[in-house]
Amino acid sequence: MDAIAARALSVVRACVTVTDARVSLDPGVMETLGIAINRYNGLTNHSVSMRPQTQAERNEMFFMCTDMVLAALNVQIGNISPDYDQALATVGALATTEIPYNVQAMNDIVRITGQMQTFGPSKVQTGPYAGAVEVQQSGRYYVPQGRTRGGYINSNIAEVCMDAGAAGQVNALLAPRRGDAVMIYFVWRPLRIFCDPQGASLESAPGTFVTVDGVNVAAGDVVAWNTIAPVNVGNPGARRSILQFEVLWYTSLDRSLDTVPELAPTLTRCYAYVSPTWHALRAVIFQQMNMQPINPPIFPPTERNEIVAYLLLVASLADVYAALRPDFRMNGVVAPVGQINRALVLAAYH
């Protein structure tokens, strides 16, 4: 499977470089395209040219790239255009060992496969408390029972209200609401001025403290917490106090936009509006894979096939589309009148 994806990626990337007839082709590009086009033409009865010049020739090369992307992703899209029919025999061309793949293409595919077979800490994009079902007003003292109470202010900040002389552990409060957190990096600070339940202004008592695994940590210092070591708070003073905890970032075993290199910019490229035709084609491919067709997903992709589709094949196909400038019709797509502008693009995403 890796070899087929790497061959498809190599061919698609090579096709980006052939649009200028005045430029001498790289020997590796000539070898890759020479063999790939010969195998593809033989199996599909197409007539793709290595140096496309006319509109029809550019269309043919783009259709070949589309066929190879769909074959590598194991996707059948059906009748989507009066000008294009998917050549299902393309997988036979990609399966042949004669088509070389370049080193970068195979490295990209192998890295994706390897990363998705294991787990490692990566920075999470959303706040640790995004899953909290309620929040409270910052700086408002509220301890309805007991001597301490913690609550969330927003997706990154929690506060602990403490009576005079109170102490307690806040592990459950500080731990993220979802996912397998590895390390949390936070700072804590006492709220100098806050309000009691009646709205009167109060000043936190001096001497409030936070310990992590029994070690005092200074206010304002970045603390690296493994979510296991006990985090204790104390207010030895004679007045009520509020401590604020701000999570700067945290790592988790969940997939993130850093799981593989350049995933975030490639998602942007995948979902960029190139033309109405490309917008529709990309949507059809993603719909067949049960992926978000128009807008990027809320959470980073978690499956190998999704990342291959995003990071390599569909983004590379967008580059080929921009380079070859194919002109073909998509069922149900009406060409816009006038120049593409922000308003038209915004309407396409809505």
Swiss-Prot record:
Subcellular localization(s) per the UniProt record: Virion
UniProt-recorded Gene Ontology molecular function terms: host cell surface receptor binding; structural molecule activity
Recorded GO CC terms: viral envelope; viral outer capsid
Alphabetized InterPro entries for the sequence: Capsid_hemagglutn, Orbi_VP7_capsid, Orbi_VP7_capsid_C, Orbi_VP7_capsid_N, Virus_capsid_a-hlx_vir
Main location, first listed in the record: virion
Glycosylation site residues: N45
Glycoprotein found in the keyword field: yes
Annotated keywords: Capsid protein, Glycoprotein, Outer capsid protein, Virion
Known role: Major structural core protein; binds to structural protein VP3. Constitutes the surface of the AHSV core.
Family: Belongs to the orbivirus VP7 family.
Protein name, per record: Core protein VP7
The species this protein was found in: African horse sickness virus
Gene, per the UniProt record: Segment-7
